[in-house]
């Protein structure tokens, strides 16, 4: 499906769908979400293929990501890189550089008490969207 809608309370349905998207990655995952928290590791990244690398671009207020990332890297190796930027608003998941999904809400709160969606990004739009976020990634700050 190109669009999946979630009613308020359909947290598990969202969880299943996003895990299916993450599981489809063969090389890399690039997640952009200004409000990520530590749950990104336990709820979603554990389902990825162990060889798949992950980049997380989050907002400057997402302090809980740093200790979780450190513990994750300690256990699984340097497969995750986290940066922060105040230049992001969207929530986007890129898979292997050629597929992408937009989340209507932040991943950490998706479908808790409001409706949301996951929409596939059109293949002809992905290169431009990815290029824009790669540029932000380059100027983003590493969590220290």
Predicted regions and their residues:
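Exposed extracellular interaction/assembly regions and N-terminal maturation sites
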Residues: 18-20
């Amino acid at each position: 499906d190109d669009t999946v809608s979630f009613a308020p309370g359909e947290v598990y349905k969202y969880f299943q769908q996003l895990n299916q998207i993450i599981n489809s990655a063969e090389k890399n995952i690039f997640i952009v979400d200004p409000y990520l928290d530590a749950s990104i590791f336990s709820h979603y990244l554990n389902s990825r293929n162990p060889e798949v690398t992950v980049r997380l671009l989050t907002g400057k207020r997402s302090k809980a990501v740093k200790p979780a990332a450190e513990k994750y890297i300690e256990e699984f190796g340097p497969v995750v890189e986290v940066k922060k930027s105040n230049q992001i608003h969207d929530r986007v998941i890129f898979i292997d550089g050629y597929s992408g999904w937009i989340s209507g809400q932040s991943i950490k709160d998706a479908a808790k008490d409001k409706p949301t969606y996951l929409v596939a990004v059109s293949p002809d739009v992905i290169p431009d969207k990815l290029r824009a976020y790669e540029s932000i990634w380059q100027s983003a700050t590493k969590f220290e």
